[in-house]
Amino acid sequence: MPDAPRKFIVDSGPLIALFDADDHYHRRALEFVRQSRAKLISTMAVITEAMYVLEDSLPARRNLLTWVQSGGLTLTEPELDDFERIMELIEKYADLPMDFADAVVVALCERLGITHVASVDRHFAIYRYKGRTKFINVFI
């Protein structure tokens, strides 16, 4: 059995599911967070996207922010040098289209050397790490 990844980047879908009990992936998200031994990394672009989707539930938004504040995630932000790559990715995948949060996730994966993501987004089956390698989705 291959070793479990030590760190991966979490997209908004699992975060939304974790804090929305009506979400299709809610149970999976709870199980995922309980069982994960990896360092969960994300970015404010992903948090912003999750907060927008959860906008109708103040308790869900509060719980998400409290969880992040308590160390549920490690936040890593794009550096100025990442923005050129983010724009390249948005242009490359314009036919999907690729949103800003996904482009940030891919750019951060590339900079940090991470090939594992946690996402419900089917586009991560299309996106390529450094243009070549498929991402390994540890969520679905």
Feature locations, PLM:
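Metal-dependent nucleic-acid phosphoesterase active-site entry motif
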Residues: 1-23
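Conserved glycosyltransferase catalytic-site signature
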Residues: 12, 44, 102-103
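Conserved residues at the C-terminal ends of beta-strands
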Residues: 120
